[in-house]
Regions:
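Core beta-strand elements of the Rossmann-like FAD/NAD(P) dinucleotide-binding domain
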Residues: 139-149
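N-terminal Rossmann-fold NAD(P) dinucleotide-binding loop
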Residues: 13-14
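FAD/FMN-dependent oxidoreductases across multiple families
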Residues: 237-304, 339, 343-346
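Conserved FAD-binding catalytic core of PHBH/FMO-like flavoproteins
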Residues: 149, 153-271
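Active-site-adjacent segment of FAD-dependent monooxygenases/related oxidoreductases
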Residues: 39-107
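Helical substrate-recognition/capping region of FAD-dependent monooxygenase/halogenase enzymes
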Residues: 2-3, 7, 18-23, 32, ...
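A conserved short coil-to-beta-strand element within the FAD-binding core of flavoproteins
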Residues: 116-130
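Glycine-rich FAD pyrophosphate-binding loop
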Residues: 21-42
Length: 519
């Protein structure tokens, strides 16, 4: 069995290798970096609920933190507050911790071969797969590798993208930030916060310092990350200027006093807006930084890359089955490029509103301008929602008020046919999930309902589907009446809500969804 070749051993490349292994698909990861995992306390990532499962890797829990809530303040006055439940809170963690956990996880699969150093220099496509030509391969290794597909997860300067001749249009440095990670010094409320026009101390001589804007995001272990947007015309930030910014911010957050603190890391980074013109050429695809760059106004590049992984892995697995699934691979490019493109447009529209840099931003007033900067952090609106995919062959809703298709599934308690109980989101990333709403299912002994009502026929229908699927039962699902069969894609998107007794509707749905013959 030919493996999938993955160019790039960053978080997206490693996550894709791990996701493919869960479908039984082998992969070869080409690590062209000489650095290994770079440990930077100020380089972190925020994972929204739809990709939070990546923070549950073994050994990673102690490196993560969830926030109890959110506050937006302007000149010290709270203009917006939100409370997070543990299930709906974003997860914040150092990026190096995520990468190290992924390295450990792929090493345990037995299905992932890591080549390091291994630099891709050329690729060839043929009818049965792809050949990758390599440079600087490990001693004794072949200078070329064959695979069923090749996925470029090799960063913003992607070799794969360049070999395909794919344009990467967009804008450079739409925002610049200074950033610091420190231990102590910030009141430990458990909340993340955006402070705009933070009250600042007076300079020597009585003049008040320019009030800064700062984003405060707690990390595990009593550490915190601070981000300050920089004016586009500002000169390079010196270490002394950054230290002054840290101290001025801490004084503003602590009623005029500078508390004890330990500065762990500092830096300056730029946010770019770019989108590859196309993401697929035959058996070669792009994902992560190779396909898109986001990050302004709190949008999360790592999270978008992990959404690429969740969307692509099961489709690659399906395309390797007899007959292939050409339509599924094309849907990856359509769905993910469309979602990221919408995010980039939202940032372009919001930047002048929030920063007041020309256009209508300087004239816009009211509460919307005060709360818009929090949208990406709260998973709200075009800046923050995970995006919705159009589902082939399905209407938007099964009925008025029914569950909205194409969105991330709502997590509910489920029971498997073997009686095992758990949460729906914990079963994502593997087979297609078929969830029957059956009031009282958690109360009854599974031995009684497994052979009753719709279950025997449904179990037979599931066994006849052209790709692996698992039948689950839940008491209820928001918006779905009793005896509704919910079709949940491996990436956690709700694909259909069907009458539980309609086997033909299920077969049509799966055929439309997978591009594979059914029945």
């Amino acid at each position: 069995m030919l493996p999938v070749i993955i160019a790039g051993a960053g978080p997206v490349g490693l996550a894709l290798a791990l996701a493919l292994s869960r479908h039984g698909v082998p992969s070869v990861v080409l690590d062209g970096s000489d650095e290994g995992v770079v440990r930077r306390a100020a380089r972190t990532c925020v994972l929204p609920p739809d990709v939070a499962h990546w923070a549950r890797l073994p050994g990673l829990v102690e490196e993560t933190t969830t926030w109890t809530g959110w506050r937006t303040t302007v000149r010290g006055k709270v203009v917006e507050e939100a409370v997070f439940t543990e299930e709906r809170s974003p997860i914040h963690l150092p990026q190096h911790a995520l990468e190290e956990a992924l390295w450990r996880a792929v090493g345990r699969t037995g299905l992932v071969e890591l080549l390091s150093p291994a630099r891709l220099v050329d690729l060839e496509q043929h009818e049965s797969g792809v050949t990758a030509h390599l440079k600087e391969t490990p001693a004794g290794d072949s200078p070329s590798r064959r695979g069923s597909h090749l996925v470029g997860c090799d960063g913003a300067r992607s070799t794969v993208r360049k070999l395909l001749g794919v344009a990467f249009p967009g804008r450079t440095a739409v925002e610049r930030y200074a950033v610091a990670a420190l231990r102590g010094g910030v009141p430990d409320t458990g909340e993340a916060a955006l402070h705009r026009a933070l009250p600042a101390p007076r300079r020597t001589g009585g003049a008040r310092a320019e009030p800064p804007e700062v984003l405060v995001r707690p990390l595990a272990g009593g550490t915190v990350r601070l981000d300050w947007p920089l004016p586009p015309e500002e000169n390079p930030v010196t270490p002394d200027a950054l230290l002054e910014r840290v101290e001025r911010t801490l004084v503003g957050l602590n009623d005029g006093e500078l508390p004890p603190h330990e500065l762990l890391d500092t830096g300056v980074y730029a946010c770019h807006q770019r989108l590859a013109r196309w993401w697929r050429s035959g058996r070669v695809l792009l994902a992560g930084d190779a396909a898109h760059l986001v990050g302004a106004l709190g949008t999360q590049q790592v999270a978008e890359g992990l959404r690429d992984v969740d969307n692509l892995a099961w489709k690659l697995a399906a395309d390797r089955r007899p007959g292939g699934a050409e339509g599924l691979l094309e849907s990856y490019a359509e769905e993910r490029r469309g979602a990221v493109g919408a995010r980039l447009r939202a940032v372009d529209q919001a930047l002048p509103v929030i920063r007041g840099r020309g256009g209508r931003g300087g004239r816009l007033t009211g509460r919307g301008r005060l709360t818009l900067p929090a949208d990406a952090h709260l998973g709200r609106g075009a800046l923050g929602e995970p995006g919705r995919y159009a589902i082939p062959g399905q209407r938007d809703r099964t009925a008025e008020g029914g569950p909205l298709l194409g969105n991330p599934v709502t997590d509910v308690a489920v029971t498997a046919l073997d009686g095992e109980r758990g949460r729906l989101v914990d079963r994502l990333g593997g087979p297609l999930l078929l969830v029957l709403t059956a009031p009282g299912a958690r109360v009854w002994d599974a031995r009684h309902w497994l052979s009753a009502g719709l279950m025997p026929d449904l179990a037979g229908a599931v066994a006849a589907l052209p790709l692996p699927a698992e039948l689950l039962v839940t008491d209820a699902y928001p918006g779905a009446p009793a005896h509704t069969l919910l079709v949940v894609r491996p990436d956690g998107r709700l694909a259909a809500a069907l009458p539980g007794a309609d086997r033909r509707a299920l077969e049509r749905c799966v055929g439309d969804l997978t591009d594979l013959p059914v029945g």
